[in-house]
């Protein structure tokens, strides 16, 4: 429903809630097959279903992901405030943490971030009259039209409520799973853990950041990130691995079931559309 607010603001007619849900869950299911395949599929699905420009739909999808990126940034800041000691422990204890700390503080990274868009802009200007650059510019403008609806769409308040609601549910998945294992229950009752909210936040943020690494639904990077996070609270590697594997496996099963439902829904919708066109 959140994405639907953007789509309508971009001039795309209201989509049935079931169809919109199918596009989301189908995307998650396809991401289990190949990284980011689901994102491409859901844009193509909506563009074909509503007979609209694909680049406009892609722009709304980028806006949707930008909203999630803002939420992750806010969660990182919150984690640095309430769990700074555990983050410092990760950066000091593990080679990965030391490498990450060096990577983010190295001036080369920031020089690249500054120079990359300048180089792209210069190259685009030099070759501005070529058909390739003109086509790219046209597609980028359509994507910007889809993305920019975030700043002037109706229902902004509801969009924000949906965004916070989605991420609260994501967090609760991680937090409630603590109750399922004896070795994580003490994180809920332990002193200084705020009823498990601090460990839950650290594990959740580590897992969320790992999703930026291309993978099949997070398999691998997400598990490693969760194991690292749990180890900061004294959970052994074997127990932490069990937590991450069981958690990920149940999520994958739910997504696969949702994907199967989505496939049947699309198949039946197309059949009904063909029958309707034949009658006409």
Indicate residue ranges for each PLM-predicted region.
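Alpha-helical transmembrane segments and their lipid-water interface positions
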Residues: 3, 31-42, 68-79, 215, ...
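Extended non-transmembrane interhelical loops and adjacent amphipathic helices
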Residues: 3-11, 21-51
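Hydrophobic transmembrane alpha-helical segments of multi-pass transport and channel proteins
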Residues: 69-70, 209-218, 236, 248-257
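Re-entrant/interfacial helical elements at transmembrane boundaries that shape
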Residues: 37-48, 215-232
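Membrane-interface alpha-helices at helix entry/exit sites of multi-pass transporters
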Residues: 17-19, 37-39, 52-65, 69, ...
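Predominantly cytoplasmic-facing regulatory/coupling regions of multi-pass membrane proteins
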Residues: 1-25, 82-208, 250-280
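Short amphipathic alpha-helical coupling elements at transmembrane boundaries
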Residues: 8, 12, 44-48, 55, ...
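Transmembrane alpha-helix interface/packing and boundary motifs in multi-pass membrane proteins
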Residues: 26-35, 202-223
